[in-house]
Amino acid sequence: DHLEFFGSMEGSAQAKAELLDHLPQDGTVVLNADDEYFDYLASRAQCRVVAFGASPKAAVRAANVRTDDKGGTLFGLVLPGKTRQTEIRIRTQGQHNVSNALAAAAVGHALGLSGAAIAEGLAKFRPAAMRSQISQSHGVQVINDCYNANPASMKAAIQLLAQLGRD
């Protein structure tokens, strides 16, 4: 979260909250309900908040998350006001990538897109090179996540490696 500019996670959250102060009351902000500063940020918003994540506070969530044999992830997209889930497939693995997909889905939902349109858009996503790229050679799995690596991306890569070991 660019700590070199803000000094701490609290400083980063305060800077984000300052951005919220400039949104119009009829605007919309999409926030990660899994973020430790979610409650603070949501309380600062004077507009509609669309929350995504695994938290019970999230309106946009993933259900029945699983991997496929092609290196992708499948899940049921839960949207507010919808009784049926929309099946989503993204071409990458890892909970962090599910969270990223949920963020995009929350934006799409906020803009009025249908679950089917969101699924179609997410299916077209292609992961960037050197971001959670999984390859296998001589029985060894390698996760190449060296593009602009930082502690959070390294943690996500290690969590993905642990997940691959269980699957």
Task: For each feature predicted by the language model, list its residue ranges.
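Acidic, Mg2+-coordinating active-site environments of NTP-dependent enzymes
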Residues: 1-141, 166
